[in-house]
UniProtKB/Swiss-Prot annotation:
An example Gene Ontology CC term for this record: cytosol
Biological processes annotated in GO: guanine catabolic process; guanine metabolic process
UniProt EC number: 3.5.4.3
GO MF annotations in UniProt: guanine deaminase activity; zinc ion binding
Family the UniProt entry places it in: Belongs to the metallo-dependent hydrolases superfamily. ATZ/TRZ family.
Name used for this protein in its record: Probable guanine deaminase
Upper classification of the organism: Eukaryota, Fungi, Dikarya, Ascomycota, Taphrinomycotina
Keyword field: Hydrolase, Metal-binding, Zinc
Length: 527
């Protein structure tokens, strides 16, 4: 989607390519068409000339970083609820299950409306990008059209994302509950079909199978979700062991299963592409099972504390060989910033160290940075593509600026070394310190370029045309009052639904119910 762009970056580079390894070095990095094609740990004139002589970089734009700037991998949010963003900062008065009923379900159900959803999703994508999130694993609502809209917005803004339409047909309010397992699965199939047109290679946006959590799904829905993920080779995301009351509910609903994790395993929902949020109260047998299945965990320390759910022992998970990343868990977590989640992960590990009387439980700076980047990349099954810097990986990167001229809230002194300045950035900075945010070799945010739809790189005509048509079809099907549209677009419309009344009532007899009123937005916001 970028064309053949090429850039060379010269300056300080910081990353954590493996757990416990923090590398701070001078570097020259060459990027062609979104990927790193040249990386030397030097920024001498000779190295720059070598980069410029690379056959793919002969016409590269040179970016020389300032003395207090450095390159850092893009941050990865492994668990965030996009529709809950308007509730950020509220709802600390009740625990998890009551919180869902009082705050979350009413808000999410209101986002069946495309215009309301558009306003929310544009702002959450803008905000997360401005905070350095280059990859987000999003829960959407149970509505297919607005989930498709979220995918369009992420694609247009240039944020890598997993987009999950929630599957939930049990123990949910009447106004926010799917009628059956089959209707839930069919709606998910529609989203998969739409996103396969929007991004066939799944380079930027990918559908993710999203059973909300075990209690919200009947057994046939859980089984169907597992089958869909297997059939389409898709990632899976859900919640596990966030709250002790939730765990007791799972035991009541699935008495034949050994544990919460065993419920997911039985329905083929524990795979190397599975992201399990929270995992605070796992039993040892469950940890062994997750290790065996190579499933990943999203550590969400902010919401774990705000909702009084508990303290997750990340050290124990890491020592067991489980991949762990960080999640903001908006809006259980109040901030759409992975750096804030990182800070809370640090505090959680220190609090738990005191409670357990074990200093080894504490996470150090390099480990925390790993969770926010390469660890998160492993959790979303993209560890070979993003999360650190290496030839062949995508250029998903931040240019961090610690200079006072950026209105920085980080105070730097002459005696500060790079490890000191890095720690200050982690614990005292905000979005004012992000000069540039790059995804796939494309500048998408940062104070030097605020992301918006008008200046984003246009989609190719083929994707825009086809994707927009299918988006209309989803909109039509789901705006029919209590009526289901045809499973596939009528062939007389060239494979797509259209808005011409004559087509629907004459050529497509039987495709739509005779008494149906089909609504099509004239301007869906897609470009």
């Amino acid at each position: 989607m970028d064309g053949h762009t090429c850039d060379v970056f010269v300056g300080k580079l910081i990353h954590t390519p493996s757990l416990g390894e923090l590398e701070i070095t001078d570097a020259t990095v060459g990027v062609y068409n979104g990927k790193i094609v040249f990386l030397e740990k030097s920024m001498t004139p000779k190295t720059l000339e070598e980069a410029k002589s690379h056959h793919l970089l002969k016409e590269a734009t040179i970016h020389k970083l300032k003395p207090l700037q450095f390159m850092f991998p893009g941050l990865i949010d492994t668990h965030i609820h996009a529709p809950q963003y308007p509730n950020s900062g509220i709802g600390i008065d009740v625990p998890l299950l009551q919180w869902l009923e009082k705050y979350t379900f009413p808000l999410e159900s209101s986002l069946a409306d495309l215009e309301e959803a558009r306003q929310v999703y544009k702002r959450v994508v803008e905000r997360t990008l401005s905070n350095g999130t280059t990859f987000a694993s999003y829960f959407s609502t149970l509505h297919t059209p607005t989930s498709a809209l979220l995918a369009e917005i992420c694609y247009s803004y240039g944020q890598r994302a997993y987009i999950g339409k929630c599957n939930m047909n049990n123990l949910s309010p009447d106004h926010y509950c799917e009628k059956s397992a089959e209707s839930s699965l069919e709606a998910t199939r529609q989203l998969i079909s739409y996103m396969s047109i929007l991004d066939p290679k799944r380079e930027m946006v990918t559908p993710i199978i999203t059973p909300r959590f075990a209690p919200s799904c009947t057994e046939d829905l859980l089984s169907g979700c597992g089958e869909l993920a297997e059939k389409h080779n898709l990632p899976i995301q859900t919640h596990i062991s966030e709250n002790t009351s939730e765990i007791e509910l799972v035991k009541e609903l699935f008495p034949e299963r050994k544990s919460y994790a065993d419920v997911y395993d039985y329905y083929k929902l524990l795979t190397p592409q599975t992201i399990l949020a929270h995992a605070i109260h796992l039993e040892d047998e469950e940890i062994e099972l997750l290790t065996k299945r190579s499933s990943g965990i999203s550590h969400c320390p902010t919401s774990n504390s705000i909702l009084a759910s508990g303290l997750a022992n990340v050290r124990k998970l890491l020592d067991s060989g489980i991949n762990v990343g960080l999640g903001t868990d908006v809006s259980g977590g109040y901030a759409p910033s992975i750096l804030i989640a990182l800070r809370h992960a640090a505090m959680t590990s220190r609090s738990l160290s005191y409670v357990l009387g074990d200093p080894k439980v504490m996470l150090d700076l390099s480990e925390l940075l790993y969770l926010a980047t390469q660890g998160g990349a492993e959790v979303v099954s993209r560890g070979d593509q993003v999360g650190s810097f290496a030839v062949g990986k995508y250029w998903d990167a931040l240019i961090v600026d610690l200079s006072a001229e950026t209105h920085s809230c980080v105070d730097i002194f002459e005696r500060d070394t790079w490890p000191v300045m890095l720690s200050k950035w982690v614990f005292t900075s905000d979005d004012r310190n992000l000069a540039q945010v790059w995804v796939n070799g494309r500048l998408v945010s940062g104070f030097e370029m605020k992301a918006n739809l008008k200046n984003s790189t246009p989609l190719t005509n083929g994707v825009t045309s086809s994707g927009h048509q299918v988006f209309k079809e989803l909109t039509q099907a789901h705006l029919l009052p209590r009526t289901q549209c045809v499973d596939t677009p009528p062939s007389c419309c060239g494979g797509h639904c259209c808005k011409e009344e004559s087509c629907r009532t004459e050529n497509c007899k039987g495709a739509y119910p005779a008494n149906a009123t089909v609504t099509v937005e004239e301007d869906s916001g897609m470009s």
